[in-house]
Amino acid sequence: ISNRYSKTNWEGTMKSIKYGLAALFSLQLATTAVAAPTGQDLGANWCSDVKMHFYAGGPEAGGFAGIVAAGAMNAIRDTGADAEIIYSEWDFEKMVRQLRESIGLGVDAIGMMGHPGDDALMPLAKQAAEKGILMTYQNVDPAGVRARFGGGYVGANLATQGKALAREAIRQFGLKAGDHAIVMVPIGDYARAQREDGARIVFEEHGMTVTVVDGNPAYASDPNTVIPIFTAALSANPKTKIIVHPGSDIMNVAEGIAKAAGYGPNEILQIGFDTSPQIMTAFEKGYVHLTSDQQPFLQGYLPVLSLCQTAVLGTGAINQDTGAGFVDTNNYKAVKALADAGLR
């Protein structure tokens, strides 16, 4: 990558700065719709005048989405926000339709999953800004939208997280050039896919061979649908050493994948992202070996808090990288109780 900074890059950066300043000014103006506090003690329901829609991403009973929603619900209770949690079954088109409805209803603030990407979200973010609706984002960062219209991001740096997971797997498991990996990547949406694709890149740079299988995000709503997909991929690549899963909802069925393909405990490495009660059980039984924790509870709690603070206090948006390191066979017991409680 060249270190030279071209005129085009400079102009693009100056445009981003200009848009960021404009978005900040619009956020400050948006606070005028909410009564200003009259003292330093905000009280128990200090955000009760703020009507908010918060997007949890997946199905209401979903593992990852359930933890995100738990974080949001705790923040709603702590702030008194007048908030509704929206579930989308990881259907990005549904997210866009629901967002359009949220804007049409004229809510004060929206905590939005960034999965639909810049192109889909940009016109709706513009509408929200024109109506004075605050927006912030969680789990996937629509960086172009935020550069233009403002808003914070609470979630992991996806590309960095995926590459770090692959490097840790190489270190822990002694993977070497020529070893084979299967990586499930949500190919249709690179804003979301960059995490798993980052793992692929690191493996290939290490000299490993990688088979990519398409990970439609909708699989997360019914994870058992991926079992025959992985079974077929493993049958076609019997020397596979390691599988990379695209999230906790899929990795929840790691034991089923291994057994369906004829593997016993610890006979094939399975790694991925996030924790859950099922993943803790899979660690115990030898079917999951490494995961990168992105603290989904914070991805629910902090966006609600951020929107309340901006609406009531005029503060800037919260930006937080929630990546928290690795859970593996040596340390999973330290987080098991929280994972079993649906908090990690």
Residue ranges and their predicted role:
Residues 109-110, 114-130, 199, 214, ...:
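Hydrophobic alpha-helical
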Residues 1-51, 126-131, 343-344:
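Short, low-complexity disordered leader/linker segments with a strong preference
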Residues 63-78, 161-165, 190-210, 225, ...:
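Short, solvent-exposed amphipathic alpha-helices that sit
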Residues 77-89, 180-182, 203-223:
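Short beta-strand elements in bilobed, periplasmic/extracellular small-molecule ligand-binding domains
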Residues 38-71, 75, 79, 84-101, ...:
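Extracytoplasmic "Venus flytrap"
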Residues 36-50, 203-206, 295-344:
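Hinge/cleft segment of the Venus flytrap/periplasmic-binding protein
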Residues 46-47, 95, 152-179, 194, ...:
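Hydrophobic alpha-helical segments within soluble ligand-binding/sensing domains
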Residues 118-119, 124-160, 171, 276-289, ...:
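Flexible loop/hinge segments that line or gate small-molecule binding clefts
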